[in-house]
Amino acid sequence: MSSTYFHSSLLAATLFSVTLTAPAFASENTQNTPQTITTKKPQPAENTFSEKNEESYWGKFKRNLTQTWDNDQYNYYLPVWTWHNRFTYDKEKTNRYNETPWGFGMGKYRYDNEGDWHGLYAMAFMDSNNRVQPIMGYGFEKMWYPGGDREGFRMGAGFTLSVTARHEYNYIPMPLPLPLVSVGYEHLSLQATYVPGTYNNGNVLFAWLRWQ
C-alpha cells in the first residue's frame, strides 16, 4: 500500500458512524368540564430511545468481541495480492511498487446464530515499499449461502475495525476502518478489502486467503 494512504482512508470511518435520533414526546392535558379528574402520570423512561439504542449497539459490539475471543476456533491468513489501481496511479509509481505482500497471520473466529462471520486477527505482510506492515483488528461479515449449506459455497460483505503501523510513521499505531468482502467454500475463503484514496495515494486492493 502507498505510504500516505492513511489520510484518505480515514474517509472510510464515515461508513461506520451511526446517526441516532430521539423521538419527541409530548403530553397533553385536556379539561372538558369544571370537574377535576385525577389521573396517574406515567413515570418517565429511565433512558431515551437513542440512549437505549446506543447502549444496545455498544453492548452487542462488546459481546461479539468477547464471544469471538472465547471461541476455540482458529483462522490462518496468507496475504496473496495487492493491486494499485492503474486508473489512479502514474505508471512510474506502479512499476516500482511491490504487489506481492508476503506474510502470515492468524486469529480466532466464530459464526453466530444467523450464520454471520466474526473474527479477531493479527497479520503482518510486506507493504508497497517492501517494508513489514502489521495489522490487527476485529472483522464482521454478513454471510449469504446460495445453496443453503453453511459448509458449502458462501459469500460475505462487511467491515473491519483495525489498527496498523508503517515504517514511514515510525510504526506509530493508527486506526484503519475498511470494508470487507469474501467468497468461500468449506474451509477456504478469499477475503479482500479496498483502501480508498486520491491520485497516487491509496486506491489499493488487498487480498488474502483465509483457512478455517
From Swiss-Prot:
Gene Ontology molecular function: acyltransferase activity
Entry's family note: Belongs to the lipid A palmitoyltransferase family.
Organism encoding this protein: Proteus mirabilis (strain HI4320)
First and last residue of the signal peptide: 1-26
Top EC group: transferase
GO cellular component entries: cell outer membrane
Subunit annotation: Homodimer.
UniProt-recorded name of the protein: Lipid A acyltransferase PagP
Gene: pagP
Record InterPro entries: LipidA_acyl_PagP, OMP/PagP_b-brl
Compositionally biased residues, Low complexity: 29-44
